[in-house]
Amino acid sequence: MEALRQRIEAAFEARAEITPATVEPSVRADVEKAIAMLDTGEARVAEKINGEWHVHQWLKKAVLLSFRIFDNGVIEGAETKYFDKVPMKFADYDEARFRKEAIRVVPPAAVRKGSFIGKNTVLMPSYVNLGAFVDEGTMVDTWATVGSCAQIGKNVHLSGGVGIGGVLEPLQAGPTIIEDNCFIGARSEIVEGVIVEEGSVISMGVYIGQSTRIFDRETGEVHYGRVPAGSVVVAGNLPSKCGTYSLYAAIIVKKVDAKTRGKVGINELLRIVD
């Protein structure tokens, strides 16, 4: 894999000269291999090592190179046709393969090739972009979007209309990450490389980016870019220093452990007790 990484890095430096007509066959083959590794889960854009998330930028570079290398083509759909550079992940699947991988895909869900979908996942009519990683047992509900290179953990529920932001550029930016056993409420948006740590519950209509204040009402601490593990978060506001206005914030109303979360329903967790 190290040799492949080095070749992808070198090709990326010369990307301005690369087009579908001029690309070297060896470069095309390397990019195709990297995309295939993302597609099968053999490689992923980000992974947790010793408790810290590490981003493999060369895989993002491979994804970006693919847009320069591959030309648009017709993609056949059940109800219509499409015209794009990236083929659909399930275009060549048959019943046996769907059953083997234990994936449910409800039409018209769209999943681009180069994204990984783990076993026992359910994809309602939703969208998963290339480079994304969706782990086992996760539900991607209706009209939810998993952006490019986003990392979704095991047993996550992305409710209807949820947006998980993608990140290809700027290149140095980290992907948006939802860790294992999280619940993201309907119409919430988690973007700009924010990390929602394990076992957290995000209520309906919560918007979190890198500049969003995440206020823990129990401790008074303010977080940016990270929702601590086991947090229950709702949309709210914090007053200005002068007291004349308030600005949006995400509010951590309580913390729960796995045992409590297993016994208590999501709706009950989201009840705010003053």
UniProtKB/Swiss-Prot annotation:
GO CC terms = cytoplasm
State where it is primarily located. cytoplasm
PROSITE patterns associated with the record: HEXAPEP_TRANSFERASES (PS00101)
Origin: domain of life: Bacteria
Q: What CDD domains is this protein classified in? A: LbH_THP_succinylT (cd03350)
Q: Which GO terms describe its biological process?
A: diaminopimelate biosynthetic process; lysine biosynthetic process via diaminopimelate
What InterPro entries does its record include?
A: DapD_Trfase_Hexpep_rpt_fam, Hexapep, Hexapep_transf_CS, THP_succinylTrfase_dom1, THP_succinylTrfase_N_sf, Trimer_LpxA-like_sf
- Binding-site residues for substrate, renumbered to this chain: R104, D141
Task: Print the keywords alphabetically.
Answer: Acyltransferase, Amino-acid biosynthesis, Cytoplasm, Diaminopimelate biosynthesis, Lysine biosynthesis, Repeat, Transferase
SUPFAM superfamilies hit by this protein: Trimeric LpxA-like enzymes
Which family does the similarity line name? Belongs to the transferase hexapeptide repeat family.
Its subunit composition reads: Homotrimer.
The name this protein carries in UniProt is 2,3,4,5-tetrahydropyridine-2,6-dicarboxylate N-succinyltransferase
Species this chain originates from: Shewanella pealeana (strain ATCC 700345 / ANG-SQ1)
The gene designation is dapD
